[in-house]
Amino acid sequence: FSLRYVQFELRLLHDLLSHLHINRGAGAFVCGEGSALTASIEGKRGMPRVKPPRTVEKGLFGKPTVLNNVETYANVPMIVKHGTDWYTGIGTPESPGTKAFALTGNVNNTGLIEVPMGITLREIIFDIGGGIRDGKKFKAVQIGGPSGGCLTESQLDSKMDFDSLTKIGAMIGS
């Protein structure tokens, strides 16, 4: 990179960070819902409100507010760099792109992983996670956070995408 390019990027980063505010919310699970989140940031009780209006119409401090999961924002630079055709070429036609999973618990390889949508649970646990510790048998996994669901050994070949998981009563969390 040229010095001029690096200086340009640093100025952009400085401009972005000078407008960034970090707010500690109430921490309640319900504050993941958009209207509850905006209420919490405003110093009010983090309770979901009746819609309409939606947050894109009237959100934070009464102004239109776009709320997305940090994972969504993390995908933007690569989509801008490579284009939408590149991004939609990853994953499945119905669930394009990648998904981050926190691989934790009784597997050999733990960590945050990013995989194409449509990968199977078996591939995540055994190929990436290295299988169950101490050669023990797989029993079940909780997916998608508190409301995501539990999958058993008979569901190891389930595809990790929105439609496939919905069909078996589970969901991918944020």
What are these regions (language model features)?
Residues 147-174:
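A structural-propensity feature for long, helix-poor, extended segments
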Residues 118-133:
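Short amphipathic, charge-patterned alpha-helical segments
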Residues 4, 74, 123:
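Alpha-helical elements of the RecA-like P-loop NTPase motor core of helicases
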Residues 27-28, 146-148:
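Short, internal active-site loops enriched in acidic
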Residues 94-95, 107, 134-135, 168-173:
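A structural signal for short secondary-structure junctions
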